[in-house]
Amino acid sequence: MNAKLRQTGEQVLIVFNIFILFLLLFTSKLVLPYWLQPIGRLHTLMLHFPIAILILAIGMDLFRFSANNNANTFYTNFSRSLLLAGTLLAGITVVMGLFLSREEGYTGDTLQWHKWTGAALFFIASLIYWLRNKKWYRTPVAAASAFIVTASLIITGHYGATLTHGDNFIMQPITSTFIKPPVPLEEAVIFADVIQPILEKKCTSCHNAHKLKGELALTDSLGIMKGGKSGKLFVPGNIATSLLLERVHLSLDEEKHMPPEGKPQLTGEEIALLSSWIN
């Protein structure tokens, strides 16, 4: 990266720090126009780039103090440029995430943790970039910096995954093997033993306390009975006018079809069980 381009990047980095700080302080007052919402929705696509680049950059920065690398102008310049690029991309991702957080359905402590750890990661990476050429910035400090950045990436990613996929997404295949054995039909409690497991498997990743899509929570009976933004979820004894089954039976390419395209779909048996429960 030539000096002029790097200087421009550094100026943009300063602007990002100020802009992100402003957004964090006034997030609750932020109202996005509809034409900016697609930018926020690019957050989940964009975030992979700064993760990969920051890990590579911070690793290269750690090893630049060896005799061979320290004397290699290309190595030192490339590691510096890579760190700048990764930090700038992290800034773009944070802005997108803050925009996305203003959309309906994102709420709760998990969102707050993801927002603040993500912002902290960006500020830490920015600080490392500005301090990396100080005389006291040597291998021990670089190692500590690498550890902090890596830990921040893991923590931020964990909360982001929880928002996207729900609690226990990674360990669910293992922990599910320890779930209590199937209850005999004659002893089953219909909601707790039949209906709730279906909702937990297919619906609660988007309809929980952390990610309240459509203002609908499906994690407990109170939320199910309350319904969401579109009204009651079902009418007992009347499957024809129940919103739950209406959305389930929509064509897969319909925007309001549930679960959304790309998510695990309800099986015919599960739909039949939900219909019988409503009746």
Which residue stretches match the model-derived regions?
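Polytopic transmembrane helical bundles with strong interfacial aromatic enrichment
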Residues: N2-V189
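Aromatic- and Gly/Pro-enriched helix-to-coil junctions and flexible linker segments
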Residues: L163-N279
